[in-house]
Swiss-Prot record:
One annotated GO biological process: glycine betaine biosynthetic process from choline
Record's protein name: HTH-type transcriptional regulator BetI
Function: Repressor involved in the biosynthesis of the osmoprotectant glycine betaine. It represses transcription of the choline transporter BetT and the genes of BetAB involved in the synthesis of glycine betaine.
Superkingdom as given in the UniProt entry: Bacteria
UniProt organism field: Cronobacter sakazakii (strain ATCC BAA-894)
Length: 202
């Protein structure tokens, strides 16, 4: 029988090993045996906790998206009374947190995006993550802009975030946070500059 309290430790080991394996060989070539060997456990342990490779991949994606939520929430928490611009920039920086832009995480996200088109469960997780980003951005822009303008601004900023992240992931170079800050700040200020006080309510 597994020791009491070992489940969270084992799950963490296996998720970390999955990220490491994907980083080296990609999601398609990653095998249960490789992941188990990297985690220092038997393949049966993976079956015990996750049933199969798809279950482990889903758990890994859930873990990455949880880290993303936590990174954004941690940056927003002290900014309850801050300006819309400051809060939007905090959301941007949360999306570019170290947990999201290190090599293994970036390769995992790329593979998950590709796999989500063919695996319904991963597809659902991807849609939830994308909708969460859009709704969070739209709510912040709505503080300053009419509803439709806020939605367009949110779509634009979400696309900019994804585009900056994707270009960095495909380049194989370290993520340039300063460049990302500059470009997203310019976009946010351009959108908010179009706000007129009498237009904020519809």
């Amino acid at each position: 029988m597994p020791k009491v309290g070992m489940q969270p430790i084992r799950r963490r080991q296996l998720i970390d090993a999955t990220l490491s394996t994907i980083n080296d060989v990609g999601i398609n070539d990653a095998t249960i045996a490789q992941i188990a060997r990297r985690a220092g456990v038997s393949a049966g342990i993976i079956s015990h906790y996750f049933k199969d490779k798809n279950g482990l991949l889903e758990a890994t994606m859930r873990d990455i998206t949880r880290q993303l939520r936590d990174a954004v929430a941690a940056r927003l928490r002290p900014l309850a009374q801050a300006s819309t611009e400051a809060r939007l920039l905090a959301i941007v920086e949360g999306n570019f947190d170290d947990t999201q832009v290190h090599s293994a995480a970036m390769k995992a996200w790329l593979d998950f995006w590709a796999s989500s088109m063919h695996q319904p469960q991963l597809g659902r997780l991807e849609r939830v993550s994308s909708r969460r980003l859009f709704s969070t951005l739209a709510a912040e822009f709505r503080r300053e802009l009419p509803r439709e303008q806020a939605r367009l601004a949110a779509h634009g900023l979400a696309s900019l975030i994804d585009g900056l992240w994707l270009r960095a992931a495909l380049s194989g170079q370290p993520f340039n946070l300063e460049t990302a800050r500059t470009l997203t700040t310019q976009f946010i200020r351009q959108q908010l500059a179009g706000a007129a006080p009498h237009e904020k309510e519809e």
